[in-house]
């Protein structure tokens, strides 16, 4: 019997021609430091081959309509099942997506309301439920005799016919924000006080406004209420004006219609055709809850059917845990003849909901906009959707499923994994969390280092075998023998010695009103189970409040007060990808490439050939490769196969023409290298070569300090992992005095091996040493243990959370009976 997959000669990314056997029907964990080749093995080889081979069994017609993976760079892969992957960063959903649509629970609910609800006739009378609805028959109202049809499930969908006509099913309407129209009321209208007239309309409006009786030479704040009303809402009257163009010095007389400030924005919005146009307009807009559907997204007709006495929009506002109980009672609330159909529909709902409850998502409501969910919540939503159907013989590749999960949430995740294996599936688990790696039947450890020095299998075997293996780097963390307390935390009585940031909020989402103090100049970690309100408190309250205070703008509606004296900068460092195209590289983002271009332009070789610094740009310069326009890749359209991106045959992926290789720079040690050769080096090697080039060396040393020494200078930034992107964003901040700055990190340990977490703590310490205040949203216990101050939220998720249940030093949290986080410390 075949009990393992065989991989021979895998060379994807940095894999060093490895051979490895992977057990089938088991949970196989892949561990290793960041950049060691874990994802290359799991996604680049196993998933790529498993999904590709399955799709190749389909017809050409079907394959043309799918995004297909290209063949992996591997000599041989045997016995790989059809594969499904759950990626580390699920895509950010669109404005129309909700928790209900994303989990497809809303489909079952719409079916319930279409088939099982009491429907209302056009004259407002409710009919009893009957099988006539399911049969598609015409209904007759017993009170007024009117004939009508019950709505179908599609007519109850806010993405189809059931959408509110005012907001088109989004639940929000965009209205003009009067505060944004005049951002600085100390200016006069002549000086440009009315912002939309400067950017969206001819400057003529100032002259016409003067003709309307408004003084344009006094500060806007000193205008009368009537004058301000003319500016914002004045009538569209035609005025005869004398016009003088300052640029061309031409003058003339014109008849022109007045566009008030509000209409200027509305008119521009109606003509927007692309993202660029929207960018110009959206700064003058604010989003309000739709006044017609009150944010439910549904039309009045879609809100009329009643089941168990309530409408579809009311059901969608229930938390999932309450909704499951409500659905359980639906069949018994109906006539005997309706129950078999009701039980069938409700059963489909309950089986999907059970998975979501197991994964700890019972606190979410179906109407919650999917774009407001955290990464961890979106990932578990994706997992529940993938495992909904009880398949067998599938290979599930899970890329860091523990992201965003509190240690107490991991139990539900491991339960789902064991269920999948019990059903006859295989699991490949890429993760760093030792709590979840301990659930694996077999571990494959990649290493020994990142990048070019990685790509080898350094250890494999069962957990006990790995713990005994001297070559393993994860072993001390699995066995619990590694030291995890790595920095000297502030003493309890000195925590607030530098002052505090005070935040006061009213209710938002499921987060209750909060009063919170954050010590300045310290490392504060915000903890709590998934859905307890960490994101709402920090990303949706603290950051917008500080931003408003720093820029002298009105506070967001739910912020009561913010006191942050001396704070002039707020910086969010999150895991969103850097750049969206292949032209953004590590060297360009870190500001090294511009410096190198100047140095190469000063070289003897460049001077002899007449090259300037601009010629060394691979985006526009004379030395870029003409075959690929400096991207390093060429896209081939192969009709019935997916588009194939291959390294450019002219420059072999270097982005530069052959002439660039002839221009060499000589370093202090007498070594010579061209710019394309230098771009092919990793940061550590480049530091050695650039030892005598002060500015370049300093910038590269910061990347090394951030634990990014293994990245090559020419590596594309969109391909970096979340953790790498986060640390690269910090490159420009390290080394500056930061006493007026607050840095907020959203789960910076994503994708980090316990050894890499030590580097991250060193980064925090470097910021703290320069006076910064560091706030971290985190589940990683090693980061939490090293905090100066912890704010623990909970106790549960959703309505069961949203409160601060404990604050203090790690020791105080550990001793606090109310803190769930404390139990794991």
What are these regions (language model features)?
Residues 1-825:
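Conserved phosphate-binding elements of NTP-dependent enzyme cores
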């Amino acid at each position: 019997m075949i009990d393992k997959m065989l991989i021979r000669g895998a060379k994807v990314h940095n894999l060093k021609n490895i051979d490895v056997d992977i057990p089938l029907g088991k949970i196989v964990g892949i561990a290793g430091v960041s950049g060691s080749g874990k994802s290359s093995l799991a996604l680049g080889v196993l998933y790529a081959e498993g999904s590709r081979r399955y799709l190749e069994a389909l017809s050409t017609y079907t394959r043309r309509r799918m995004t297909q993976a290209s063949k992996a760079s591997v000599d041989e892969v045997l016995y790989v099942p059809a594969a499904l992957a759950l990626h580390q960063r699920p895509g950010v959903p669109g404005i129309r997506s909700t928790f209900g649509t994303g989990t497809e629970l809303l489909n079952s609910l719409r079916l319930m309301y279409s088939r099982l609800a009491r429907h209302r006739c056009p004259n407002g009378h409710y009919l009893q439920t009957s099988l006539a609805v399911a049969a598609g028959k015409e209904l007759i109202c017993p009170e007024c005799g009117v004939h009508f049809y019950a709505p179908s499930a599609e007519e109850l969908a806010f993405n189809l016919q059931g959408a509110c006509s005012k907001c088109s099913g989004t639940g929000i309407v965009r209205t003009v924000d009067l505060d944004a129209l005049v951002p600085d009321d100390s200016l006069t209208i002549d000086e440009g006080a009315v912002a939309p007239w400067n950017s969206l309309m001819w400057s003529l409006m100032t002259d016409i406004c003067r003709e309307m009786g408004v003084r344009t030479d006094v500060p806007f704040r000193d205008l009368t209420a009537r004058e301000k009303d003319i500016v914002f809402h004045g009538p569209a009257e035609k005025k005869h004006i004398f016009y003088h163009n300052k640029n061309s010095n031409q003058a003339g007389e014109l008849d022109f219609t007045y566009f008030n400030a509000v209409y200027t924005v509305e008119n521009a919005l109606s003509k927007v055709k692309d993202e660029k146009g929207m960018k110009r307009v959206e700064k003058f807009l604010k989003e309000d809850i739709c006044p017609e559907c009150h944010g439910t997204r549904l039309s009045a007709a879609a809100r009329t059917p009643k089941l168990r006495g309530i409408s579809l929009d009311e059901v969608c506002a229930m938390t999932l845990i309450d909704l499951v109980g409500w659905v359980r009672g639906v069949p018994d609330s109906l006539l005997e003849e309706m129950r078999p159909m009701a039980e069938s529909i409700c059963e489909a709902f309950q089986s999907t909901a059970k998975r979501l409850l197991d994964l700890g998502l019972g606190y979410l409501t179906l109407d919650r906009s999917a774009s407001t969910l955290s990464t961890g919540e979106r990932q578990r939503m994706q997992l529940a959707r993938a495992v909904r159907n009880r398949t067998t013989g599938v290979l599930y590749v899970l890329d860091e499923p523990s992201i965003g999960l509190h240690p107490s949430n991991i139990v539900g995740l491991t339960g789902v994994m064991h269920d999948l294996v019990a059903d006859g599936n295989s699991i490949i688990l890429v993760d760093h969390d030792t709590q979840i790696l301990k659930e694996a039947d077999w571990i494959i450890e990649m290493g020994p280092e990142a990048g070019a020095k990685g790509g080898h299998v350094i250890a494999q075997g069962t957990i006990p075998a790995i713990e005994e293996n001297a070559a393993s780097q994860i072993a001390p963390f699995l066995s619990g023998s590694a030291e995890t307390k790595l920095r000297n935390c502030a003493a309890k009585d000195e925590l607030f010695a530098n002052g505090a940031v005070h935040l006061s909020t009213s209710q938002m989402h499921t987060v209750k009103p909060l009063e919170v103090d954050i010590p300045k100049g310290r490392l504060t970690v915000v903890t709590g189970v998934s859905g307890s309100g960490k994101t709402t408190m920090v990303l949706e309250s603290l950051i917008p409040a500080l931003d408003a205070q720093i820029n002298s703008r009105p506070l967001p509606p739910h912020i009561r007060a913010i006191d942050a004296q001396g704070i002039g900068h707020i910086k969010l460092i999150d895991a969103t990808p850097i750049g969206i195209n292949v032209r953004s590289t590590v060297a360009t983002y870190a500001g090294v490439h511009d410096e190198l271009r100047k140095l190469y332009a000063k070289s003897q070789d460049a001077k002899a050939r007449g090259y300037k610094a601009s010629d060394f740009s691979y985006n526009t310069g004379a030395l870029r490769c003409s075959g690929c326009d400096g991207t390093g890749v060429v896209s081939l359209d192969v009709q019935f196969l997916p588009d194939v991106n291959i390294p450019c045959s002219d420059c072999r992926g270097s982005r530069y023409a052959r002439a660039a290789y002839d221009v060499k720079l000589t370093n202090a040690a007498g070594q010579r290298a061209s710019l394309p050769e230098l771009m092919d080096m990793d940061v550590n090697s480049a530091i050695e070569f650039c030892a005598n080039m002060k500015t370049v060396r300093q910038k590269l040393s910061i990347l090394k300090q951030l634990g990014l020494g293994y990245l090559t200078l020419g590596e594309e930034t969109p391909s970096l992992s979340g953790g790498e992107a986060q640390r690269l964003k910090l490159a420009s901040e390290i080394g500056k005095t930061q006493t007026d700055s607050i840095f907020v990190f959203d789960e910076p340990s994503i994708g980090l091996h316990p050894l890499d977490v030590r580097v991250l703590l060193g980064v925090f310490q470097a910021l703290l040493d320069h006076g910064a205040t560091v706030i971290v949203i985190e589940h990683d216990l090693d980061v939490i243990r090293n905090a100066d101050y912890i704010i623990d939220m909970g106790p549960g998720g959703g309505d069961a959370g949203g409160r601060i249940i404990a604050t203090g030093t790690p020791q105080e949290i550990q001793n606090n009976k109310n803190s769930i986080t404390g139990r794991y410390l």
